[in-house]
Swiss-Prot record:
One Pfam family cited in the UniProt record for this chain: p450
Chemical reaction(s) catalysed: 9beta-pimara-7,15-diene + 3 reduced [NADPH--hemoprotein reductase] + 3 O2 = 9beta-pimara-7,15-dien-19-oate + 3 oxidized [NADPH--hemoprotein reductase] + 4 H2O + 4 H(+)
Keywords (A to Z) from UniProt: Heme, Iron, Membrane, Metal-binding, Monooxygenase, Oxidoreductase, Plant defense, Transmembrane, Transmembrane helix
Membrane topology reported for the UniProt record: Multi-pass membrane protein
Function: Involved in momilactone phytoalexins biosynthesis; acts as a multifunctional diterpene oxidase. Participates in the biosynthetic steps between 9-beta-pimara-7,15-diene and 3-beta-hydroxy-9-beta-pimara-7,15-dien-19,6-beta-olide. Also catalyzes consecutive oxidations at C19 of syn-stemod-13(17)-ene.
Record field: transmembrane: 4-26, 106-128
Miscellaneous: 3-beta-hydroxy-9-beta-pimara-7,15-dien-19,6-beta-olide is a precursor of the phytoalexins momilactones A and B. Phytoalexins are diterpenoid secondary metabolites involved in the defense mechanism of the plant and produced in response to attack (by a pathogen, elicitor or UV irradiation). Momilactone B can also act as an allochemical (an antimicrobial and allelopathic agent), being constitutively produced in the root of the plant and secreted to the rhizosphere where it suppresses the growth of neighboring plants and soil microorganisms.
GO terms under cellular component: membrane
The EC number(s) this enzyme carries: 1.14.14.111
Cell compartments where the protein resides: Membrane
UniProt-listed SUPFAM superfamilies: Cytochrome P450
Name the UniProt record assigns to this protein: 9-beta-pimara-7,15-diene oxidase
């Protein structure tokens, strides 16, 4: 989330040369009382140069090693505090949760989420609380997850068939391409139901893919709020607005079809709530679109990238692969595919593998930024109202201070059950915690577990000829999620063709 948009970087260099802006950009923060320690800041750009040396989560971890787990960094004009310890994270996300429960307004979310009407970036308040309740009770509940089981079953079996076709002749293929297609199609069918035909669905996903390309960091105006006009001058804002309009055009057609074809899709559920008019706030089709867009941005790439990281870790650790595959096959053998989802609860070791994958490869290395709503203290330091707060979950999850053999892939470390997805241990926050915790973990895990189980059951996996486990690079790139920079190439050999069970 701290990646700096390349266009913003170029613009930044240009602006630095304009002396007329010097006085504006070098204004000092009015409060220095017990401010957290931090690295040096330059006039104009603050501490942005510290983030250009390596991946942001890595650079911030290294800086925290010198300046402490509560660290101040001025990013452009924005005062930012970086949290890198479980104790400080607990203060922010539990003890003073309400104080840090809001979000800053960022250009991309402002435009694509219809003025931050989505649950991810809506400012904290009565509207957001209503939205959160609507999502947890209606859209992302255990009941809704069960209701979507037939779609999950169908799309994950389709994934297996697509892998069988791609792996013909034991040729290496790119697993990520098929995973993304599977998760996109599942989310589209869950969101839109049968009302959204193949062509309309494809138009929506194409437009969404273009939009997500802009989700890889902060825009210039996000770092220099008084200079937001720069984003308009460079044409960035107009490009984002054109993309939103393109997405909106397809979205409106889908919503219209859902309105004329009542069903149980997520859009239909929201439309019924809209028509009932029982909410405390005006609720229109625009709100419906903002919520559904969150489902795609927060769900599809999350599941596909996590699965690819998991397969990467298993290929690097053959003994873990053998153990988890034996468990899955022991449970699934001689069972109908229609029974697979009901048997997932018996795959205890596979669940540990997923947990360990999310420890080493969190979906968001830096949790979505929080906004301090009133001046308070964290770790004995004053955090001023309006400060952005970043939680470096990646750094805590890989710290030898909190984990034995922190860099090794050891699923057994979770056997004691003390770490869960709800934030029971603050050094492990794959979905965040507190009020702004991701509400879709049950929804996401149901799909992720079935995909992983079927990949392990139906195929034996190997690396391309001449490649060894140690040759797999684990370099990441941060966009909407942290995904592999170079997609994994694998060879799949059918263990038991799906046709034998169908």
């Amino acid at each position: 989330m701290m990646e700096i948009n390349s266009e913003a970087t170029v613009t930044l260099v240009s602006v630095v040369t304009l002396p007329i802006l010097l006085a504006l950009l070098t204004r000092k923060s009015s409060s220095k009382k017990r401010r957290p320690p931090g690295p040096w800041n330059l006039p104009l750009v603050g501490g942005l140069l510290h983030l250009l040396r390596s991946q942001p989560q890595v650079a911030l971890r290294d800086l925290a090693g010198k300046y402490g787990p509560v660290m101040f960094l001025r990013t452009g004009q924005v005062d930012t505090v970086v949290i890198s310890s479980p104790a400080a994270a607990q203060e922010v996300l539990r003890d003073k949760d309400v104080t840090f429960a809001s979000r800053p307004s960022l250009l991309v979310s402002e435009i694509f989420c219809y003025g931050n009407l989505d649950i991810g970036f809506a400012p904290y308040g009565a509207y957001w609380r209503m939205l959160r309740k609507l999502c947890t009770v209606e859209l992302l509940s255990t009941k809704m997850v069960r209701q979507l089981a037939p779609i999950r079953d169908g799309e994950t079996l389709a994934l297996v068939r697509n892998i069988e076709a791609a792996a013909g002749g034991k040729k290496p293929f790119t697993l990520a391409t098929l995973l993304i297609s599977c998760t996109n199609t599942f989310t589209a069918k869950a969101a839109f139901g049968q009302a959204c035909g193949g062509e309309l669905q494809e138009q929506f996903l194409t437009a969404l893919d273009e939009a997500l390309k802009f989700s890889n960091g902060f825009c210039f105006g996000d770092l220099f709020p008084s200079l937001r006009f720069i984003d308009a001058m460079t044409g960035l804002r107009s490009r984002l607005e054109r993309l939103r309009l393109q997405l909106d055009t397809v979205f409106d057609k889908i919503v219209a079809q859902c309105e004329s074809n009542p069903g149980d899709s997520l859009v239909n559920v929201l439309l019924r709530i809209k028509d009932q008019g029982e909410l405390d706030f005006p609720f229109s089709s625009t709100h419906v679109k903002a919520i559904i867009l969150d489902m795609f941005t927060g769900g599809t790439e999350t599941t596909s990238s996590t699965t690819e990281w998991l397969m990467s870790e298993l290929m690097r650790n053959p003994e873990v692969m053998a153990k988890v595959q034996a468990e899955v096959r022991g449970v699934f053998d001689n069972k109908s595919p229609q029974d697979h989802e009901g048997l997932l609860e018996n795959l205890s070791y596979m669940k540990l593998v997923i947990k360990e994958t999310l420890r080493l490869n969190p979906v968001l290395p830096l949790l979505l930024p929080h906004l301090c709503r009133e001046t308070c203290e964290i770790g004995g330091y004053e955090i001023v109202e309006g400060t952005r707060v970043l939680i470096n979950s990646w750094a805590m999850a890989r710290s030898p201070e909190y984990w034995d053999d922190a860099e090794k892939f050891i699923p057994e470390r979770f056997e004691d059950g003390t770490a869960d997805f709800k934030g029971s241990r603050f050094e492990y926050l794959p979905f965040g915690t507190g009020r702004r915790r991701c509400p879709g973990d049950i929804f996401a895990m149901a799909t992720l577990e079935l995909i992983v189980a079927r990949l392990l059951y139906y195929f034996d996996w190997s690396l391309p000829d001449g490649m060894q486990p140690g040759d797999i690079d684990m370099e990441l790139v941060v966009g909407a999620t942290a995904r592999r920079k170079n997609h994994l190439q694998l060879v799949a050999s059918p263990y038991k063709p799906i046709s034998m069970q169908s």
